[in-house]
């Protein structure tokens, strides 16, 4: 089948069962296809000799119930008379000898790395939001303040959903916040942040590097112990992905992609301070977070197995309720140094959909796209 793509091949007069003393050529002959995607069918011809018909088995025979079943059907429909890069991919698949390997190869080809683009972006947003919260809750000594938070951390996201890759990540960056007390009730601020986040997909050589810039406008009102807060945030992340396919013969195909993700968020919170001690207070609160995220269409470059990924967007409507316990302690009676901390419990519920299903297409074969695995709801 190498170099050609037909669904049926005929090998004529392969065996002659009537040959006297012919060893394996004598009597009945057992025939088995080496390729898992072809069936070998022996047929006795008019001369009493054995012809072998090699018949293609559909790829989706091996993927029923799998998330990449639609992908398998798409490339099966384009098998006949394929040429160029498409033929190179089919030639590789035709040499696979067992079902586990054909399933693994089809799953790698389909592009599971791109199933959770938005999930990775939300991890970046979470790091920046935590840094902003720390600055906003630090005490202002004057009416105009500039605060800086140096960001360094790591995390891990584990996925139990088939076709969605788990990953570890490291983040470094900085966030600066300038606040101005316009009146004793109203504080206005703006912020600028940058992070570099490196994602490493588990059990693969796939990597995603993201450079993120965030701008923010912030308003806080305080009236009789009540606190009203609004944060309007805009972000853009510049992603560079490296994706690798490891074939059954240990050869690798490497692809690269560049794309941008854009996001907007509005954080709104109302809370009430209750002093329960000189340096301790309880803050029950309720909030509403609104968000929107989108990424553009993009294509990989590199090997024949390169993908094209469809644009996608997502939105968030997330109400929340909770309580925080905040405390501080001065280090010495004359010291200006303090230790501050807070602990809390809260509940939030996502009414939107921040993990809309992604779609991709194998550029050399698919005219359209196939659906990637659906990430689990938060």
Description of each model-found segment:
Residues 220, 276, 292, 305-378:
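Outer membrane beta-barrel transmembrane domains
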Residues 1-97:
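Extracellular, surface-exposed repeat/solenoid domains
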Residues 49, 54-62, 115, 123, ...:
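Primarily extracellular Gram-negative trimeric autotransporter adhesin
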Residues 160, 202-204, 240-246, 294-302, ...:
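Outer-membrane beta-barrel and related beta-rich outer-membrane complex signature
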Residues 149-155, 193-197, 232-239, 285-297, ...:
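Short glycine-rich beta-strand segments
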Residues 249-255, 302-310:
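Short helix/strand-bridging catalytic loops that position acidic/His residues to coordinate divalent metals
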Residues 90-277:
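Outer membrane beta-barrel translocator domains of Type V secretion systems
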Residues 52, 148, 219, 284, ...:
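Conserved small-residue
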């Amino acid at each position: 089948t190498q170099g050609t793509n037909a669904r049926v091949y005929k090998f004529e007069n392969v065996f002659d069962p009537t040959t006297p003393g012919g060893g394996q050529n004598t009597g009945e002959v057992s025939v088995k296809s080496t390729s898992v995607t072809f069936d070998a069918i022996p047929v006795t011809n008019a001369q009493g000799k054995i012809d072998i018909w090699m018949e293609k088995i559909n790829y989706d025979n091996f993927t029923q119930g799998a998330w990449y079943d639609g992908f398998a059907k798409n490339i099966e429909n384009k098998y006949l008379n394929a040429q160029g890069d498409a033929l190179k991919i089919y030639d590789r698949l035709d040499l696979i000898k067992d079902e586990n390997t054909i399933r693994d190869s089809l799953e790698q080809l389909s592009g599971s790395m791109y199933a959770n683009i938005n999930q990775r972006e939300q991890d970046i947003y979470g790091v920046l939001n935590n840094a902003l919260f720390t600055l906003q809750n630090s005490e202002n000594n004057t009416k105009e303040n500039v605060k800086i938070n140096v960001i360094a951390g790591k995390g891990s996201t584990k996925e139990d959903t088939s076709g969605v890759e788990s990953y570890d990540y490291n983040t470094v960056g900085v966030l600066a916040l300038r606040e101005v007390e316009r009146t004793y009730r109203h504080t206005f601020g703006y912020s600028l942040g940058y992070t570099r986040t490196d994602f490493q997909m588990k059990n693969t050589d796939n990597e995603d590097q993201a450079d993120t810039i965030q701008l923010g406008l912030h308003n806080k009102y305080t009236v009789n112990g009540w606190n009203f807060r609004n944060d309007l945030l805009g972000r853009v992340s510049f992603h560079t992905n490296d994706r690798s396919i490891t074939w059954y013969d240990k050869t690798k195909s490497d692809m690269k992609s560049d794309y941008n993700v854009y996001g907007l968020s509005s954080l709104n919170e109302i809370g009430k301070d209750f002093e329960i001690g000189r340096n301790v207070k309880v803050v029950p609160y309720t909030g509403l977070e609104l968000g929107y995220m989108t990424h553009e269409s993009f294509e990989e470059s590199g090997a024949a197995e390169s993908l094209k990924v469809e644009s996608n967007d997502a939105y968030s409507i997330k109400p929340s309720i909770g309580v925080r316990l905040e405390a501080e302690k001065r280090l010495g009676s004359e010291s200006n140094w303090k230790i501050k901390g807070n602990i809390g419990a809260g509940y939030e519920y996502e009414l939107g959909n921040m993990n809309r299903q992604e779609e991709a297409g194998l550029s050399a074969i698919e005219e359209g796209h196939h659906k990637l695995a659906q990430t689990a709801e938060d």
